A protein has these predicted regions:
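Small-residue-biased structural context
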Residues: 1-237
Length: 237
């Protein structure tokens, strides 16, 4: 179903009760719990947020099939970069340490000398290195570059600049997504020996929630920001 699930007049508290995975997403916009009965629109007005942008982010997060490229291309580059920067910060500050903590307990509580555990540990380390390297590159090089192009072209949202042809690119698999999928797969298929099932679930649950978040981040990154930048580059030449 390609329809959005959340609309401006809905009570945000009801949406969050049904989809608690949205809590970190609304936190990135400065909206904290204690939502009362306020609608999405009212909360956006109170926080001086663009309701359209918040709703698009929420809906693309909840429904992988829903991805309104044309609409996303009308937002300003700075809005998109601000959101991607905040998701990066969330990975560094919360999600990576969270997986690491669960993984540490899980490994220490399992049978010593279990070969799968070493493999899981190594996979997580390479995933963490890749993700941190990408975030550093984003902060130092990629995002500032996107913003400088956007400033050159003035204050117009990219989608409205005359002559800006945005074509969505087909992309090869993202290494970060692939490493996470492998990590999950190793745990599901190859765990052996004696281990704590509850801790195992905690590790898998934290991996899955990061995976969902990164998939949305990547859709915005590759299908919106990258094509916007290519289009802006052509105009700046």
């Amino acid at each position: 179903d390609k329809m959005p699930l959340v609309y401006p007049n809905m009570q945000l508290s009801e949406v969050v009760e049904e989809h608690p995975s949205l809590i970190p997403v609304i936190n990135r916009f400065g909206i904290r719990l204690g939502l009362g009965d306020k609608s999405v629109k009212t909360l956006c007005e109170e926080h001086s947020l663009d309701t359209d942008f918040l709703l698009t982010v929420i809906n693309t997060f909840l429904n992988e099939e829903y991805f309104p490229e044309k609409k996303l291309q009308t937002f300003h580059t700075s809005q998109i970069i601000d959101y991607l920067t905040k998701t990066n910060q969330y990975y560094l500050r919360y999600q990576l340490p969270n997986i690491e903590r669960h993984l540490g307990s899980f490994i220490s509580m399992s049978t010593p000398g279990n070969p799968t555990l070493g493999l899981i540990g190594r996979f997580f380390s390479s995933f963490k290195e890749e993700l941190i390297a990408r975030i550093e590159k984003d902060d130092k090089i990629w995002f500032p570059y996107c913003m400088s192009l956007s400033k050159k072209l003035g204050k117009e949202p990219a989608g409205t600049i005359d002559g800006l042809q945005i074509t969505s690119e087909q992309r090869t698999e993202d290494t970060i997504e692939a490493l996470l999928a492998d990590l999950k797969s190793i745990m599901v298929k190859h765990l052996s020996g004696d281990y704590d099932e509850n801790l195992c679930y905690a590790v898998l649950f934290s991996i899955c929630s990061l995976e969902k978040d990164i998939k949305q981040h990547n859709r915005i990154r590759y299908r919106i920001l990258t094509p916007m930048v290519s289009a802006m580059e052509k105009l700046c030449i």
